[in-house]
Amino acid sequence: MKSYLAKENEVQRKWYVIDVEGKPLGRAASQVATILRGKNKPTYTPNVDTGDYVIILNAEKVALTGKKLDQKMLRHHSLYPGGLKEISYKKALESKPEFVFQEAVRRMLPQGPLGRKMLKKLKVYRGSEHNQEAQKPEVLELRY
């Protein structure tokens, strides 16, 4: 019996649309990362991008549990001395909720060229409208 190795040109990709309104950020992001990687398919191969496309709606209404909304900080560094910039998740969700969700998913994907390729299949929208109707996405309900 031979092991199956997926090839890039043989992968059948689907489009999914997920509404994250009221869902915890980390739980939603982990399930989205699994779909983007293709780990939900029996044809998963670690070194090949076998994942599907995901459209996220209502990113501004994602939930953070406990006191994380006020206490947890979103940090990045400008690479200059003293260049650590930080903003609370409350302010970040008000100004750029798409970035907050995308960043949570990015940190759950592989760090490298394959991970960047997987992240390009993620489309995040602030409201409940998106412009990918031509792809006929399936509505996907998150497990928790």
Curated annotation (Swiss-Prot):
Keywords: Ribonucleoprotein, Ribosomal protein
Keyword Ribosomal protein: yes
Alphabetical list of Gene3D superfamilies matching this protein: Ribosomal protein L13
InterPro entries given in the database record: Ribosomal_uL13, Ribosomal_uL13_bac-type, Ribosomal_uL13_CS, Ribosomal_uL13_sf
Pfam family, one: Ribosomal_L13
One BP term from GO: translation
One GO cellular component term: cytosolic large ribosomal subunit
GO MF term set: mRNA binding; structural constituent of ribosome
Keyword Zinc: no
Role noted for this protein: This protein is one of the early assembly proteins of the 50S ribosomal subunit, although it is not seen to bind rRNA by itself. It is important during the early stages of 50S assembly.
Family: Belongs to the universal ribosomal protein uL13 family.
HAMAP family membership: Ribosomal_uL13 (MF_01366)
Subunit structure, interactors included: Part of the 50S ribosomal subunit.
Record's protein name: Large ribosomal subunit protein uL13
The species this protein was found in: Clostridium novyi (strain NT)
